[in-house]
């Protein structure tokens, strides 16, 4: 059984990680251990590079805390070009896989609040009245009328980031 360290305790992210790993490696093939680690970037990262750096830092910090694992996974959400997206970073002892998720354009009223210094999650909670929306469907769920959720978008990115781990051509 693969020991997978999730460098987050966010249920939406953990669900995406578990579902993707089980789809790639088989149901019941992994045990996910969520841990809280620092990203080393602001709570609301801006730009692709800052966001990817946050995910890479989370993986590095998770590896320090749990060096015995088989995989370390981080999902860092950010804002870039008036949209929200995330970077997924997955490492094993030998490999790294990275993928950027789909992007969701954000309304100007939401962006104004985020640019004023609030993170997207709290802004969306105020906008919708849903507590801790970032741990649930997120802005993605709200603005796609529930057709997609944070977890479903992250799931695709985790699947893509796992590609080097089960395709020999990457090695």
Curated annotation (Swiss-Prot):
Its EC number is 3.6.1.73. One of its GO terms (biological process) is nucleotide metabolic process. Its cofactor is Mg(2+); Mn(2+). Gene3D superfamilies: 3.90.950.10. SUPFAM superfamilies: ITPase-like (SSF52972). Keywords: Hydrolase, Magnesium, Manganese, Metal-binding, Nucleotide metabolism, Nucleotide-binding. It holds the Pfam family NTPase_I-T. Homodimer. Phosphatase that hydrolyzes non-canonical purine nucleotides such as XTP and ITP to their respective diphosphate derivatives. Probably excludes non-canonical purines from DNA/RNA precursor pool, thus preventing their incorporation into DNA/RNA and avoiding chromosomal lesions. Belongs to the YjjX NTPase family. This is Inosine/xanthosine triphosphatase. It comes from Salmonella arizonae (strain ATCC BAA-731 / CDC346-86 / RSK2980).
């Amino acid at each position: 059984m693969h020991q997978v360290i999730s460098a987050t305790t966010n249920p939406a992210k953990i669900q995406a990680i578990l579902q993707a790993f089980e789809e790639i490696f088989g149901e019941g093939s992994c045990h996910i251990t969520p841990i809280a680690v620092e990203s080393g970037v602001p709570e609301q990262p801006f730009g692709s590079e800052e966001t990817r750096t946050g995910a890479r830092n989370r993986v590095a910090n998770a590896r320090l805390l749990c060096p015995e694992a088989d995989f370390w996974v981080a999902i860092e959400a950010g804002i870039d070009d008036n949209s929200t997206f995330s970077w997924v970073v997955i490492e094993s002892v030998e490999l790294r896989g990275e993928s950027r998720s789909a992007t969701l354009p954000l309304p100007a009223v939401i962006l104004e609040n985020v640019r004023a210094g609030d993170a997207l999650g709290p802004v969306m909670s105020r906008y919708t009245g849903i507590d801790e929306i970032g741990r649930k469907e997120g802005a993605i769920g709200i603005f796609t009328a529930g057709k997609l959720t944070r977890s479903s978008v992250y799931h695709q990115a985790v699947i893509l980031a796992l590609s080097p781990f089960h395709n020999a051509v990457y090695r």
